[in-house]
Amino acid sequence: GLRVLDLGCGSGQPIAEWFVRRGDAVTGVDGAAAMIVELRARVPEVHAVRADMRALDLGETYDIILAFNSFFHLGAESQRSMFPIFAAHAATGSRLLFTTGPAHGEAWGTVGQSEVYHMSLAPDAYRDLLAEHGFKDLWFRPEDPDLNGHSVWLAEFTGA
């Protein structure tokens, strides 16, 4: 199976759970203690790590790095600072999948009872950050109807 790093994994459902069912080895990272407790209860096969993704240094590389519905809750500078962290956890050929908004901007949304912050840089800024940190932009699908309206990026680490 593949080695998967799920950043901002929350409860592990549905993403980490899906990879585990496939037979992949998943490391789930979340900064919230309550989410790590829930992750361990719901998907015990996941290697659960309580950590702030913005300061992550696991000393390992992964085939797939995910920051799905997590990365876009960070501010602009924190998002920029994530690209060296993505690269540090990638090997040649690793895939990076992350969600942003469709264009530059900030918004507030609701998750359950909580208000949550969303922030996105312009697509060209993400393309520049990917290239600068050794990733090849494979595609960007803004507000993709096949992905529940999420704006999703896929990139491959070339190390170049």
Q: Where do the PLM segments sit?
A:
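Class I SAM-dependent methyltransferase SAM/SAH-binding core
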Residues: 5-7, 11-55
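A conserved beta-strand element that flanks and buttresses the S-adenosyl-L-methionine
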Residues: 66-67
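A short His-aromatic
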Residues: 73-74
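A short glycine-rich, Lys/Arg-flanked "PGG" loop and its adjoining helix->strand segment in the class I
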Residues: 80-92
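Conserved beta-strand signature within the Rossmann-like core of class I S-adenosyl-L-methionine
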Residues: 93-100
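Short, glycine-/aromatic-enriched active-site segment of Class I SAM-dependent methyltransferases
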Residues: 101-117
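Short alpha-helix
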Residues: 118-133
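Core SAM-dependent methyltransferase catalytic element
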Residues: 142-160
